[in-house]
Amino acid sequence: MLFRSTESLVAWDEQVANFGGEIIAARLQALSEFEPIFQEIYRDISSEKPAFITYKSSIEEPTQNPLENSTKILERMKVTRASEIERGLTLTGPHRDDLLLNLGDHLVKGYASHGESWSIALSLKLATYQLLEKDGLKPILILDDVFSELDEERRVHLIKLAKTAQQTFITVAVENDLPKELSGDRFFVKSGQVSKISKSAEVK
């Protein structure tokens, strides 16, 4: 839709600001609960560098107060009005925000090693699992061929964390990648056929 008058945008700006302020506040609230769990898990998996999450916003100093965020969105929209009209898109609001993963003083993207990236990804998954569990849900933990990507130290830490889950599904391409410390039923899948195997059985 092409607006020929900036006056037509006022009502839309208010809607974006009101709902946007609430969304940003809710995200920050969720992040305040999620990040400590994520950091603790990452420390258990890899203690080399501290990991943390930064909320990158299109407004300055977003808070958990929806009204404050809405006011800042409206103020920012006034500044970017000409650019928005020229480009045909809204440059301020929660749709422009992002979460940045940090490892020490660097962004994970473009800096973290393969092992560190896997540790970060696992920490995010496990933190999500624990947060859902904390809210009274009973999630299932699914780990898809992760042990082959980790060094021995990280494998040991992940095994300890996996044991705390009520129900876990783990897939591996090679049976030896599945740690012997983990108990439970094991199945071999080939060409769409599923067969149960013993813990000590060798898959050929």
Positions of PLM-derived features:
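Walker B catalytic acidic pair
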Residues: 144-146
